[in-house]
């Protein structure tokens, strides 16, 4: 089974059971964004997490095995068409260079890890319209000289 087939089976089971990413994350003891990334095939899960998720979703051992397989990290390089994903693409396009400058002023020359990393999504109620709070928490990795 490949990661795409795994993803389709998980999404169908998730819908059939009426579960949210928060529900599934709470069931397996992981963060919702991380768990969703595993189910989309962009990360791999430890065996115990994969097995527990498959028990919750009533999926077989083949799905669990695919959840534990190392992924090929990559994505479609075209401009995103989904409006929400496009807004994130736009944020990086508009604010990426200034954000890089601010980070490097505070930390020096380097990068923010997406490996030693976590991400959280929160809903902030606001009378003018609820807001999305994204928290990206990555370890700073300085470039070294040799």
UniProtKB/Swiss-Prot annotation:
The UniProt record lists the EC number as: 4.2.1.104
- Which Pfam families does this chain map to? Cyanate_lyase, CYNS_N
- Among its keywords, does the record have Metal-binding? no
Q: Which PANTHER family match?
A: CYANATE HYDRATASE
Note the HAMAP family from the entry.
Cyanate_hydrat
Question: What family is this?
Answer: Belongs to the cyanase family.
Q: What is this protein called?
A: Cyanate hydratase
